Amino acid sequence: QNLKVPTFPKNSSEFESAEVRYSSMNLGDNITNNFDGIYDTQYKLDKDGFVTLVIADEIPELREKAEIAGYNFMPWTLPGNKGYLIYRNLLTKGGKTAPYSLNKTPMPNFTTNRSHLISHDAKKYIGAYAPTGLRMTKDEYLSDFGGFNDKFRE
């Protein structure tokens, strides 16, 4: 996952100047179990304010590669191979008009469009602030992050 995150407070004196009060990425399932998560003050940000999050099996060489690259690592702890990645940001400065407001992304209508993933791609509504992901094999990841750096920095 890769996304630009709004600024968040490092302490209570920054509440008024930060773009959001809190943001997090959580890994869960369809019955709302939360298996793991990372929140804003834990993020490793790159020089452009982006967070790159590697979600993979807890294998030392996978974690180490992410850490050496300066990426965040979250172990895949869900049973099976399906899960939900939930991105949250709370109390947005600027409200619904802020470029990073999740309120800009409409709720999907499951009655008329069961596969709402394309029509409701958050990137259409909040641009670089939307999480973007790329699935790859272990070998692809170990060789060059599955081409991740090229695909998301174009």
Pin down the residues of each PLM region.
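A compositional/structural signature for long, glycine/proline-rich flexible linkers
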Residues: 1-154
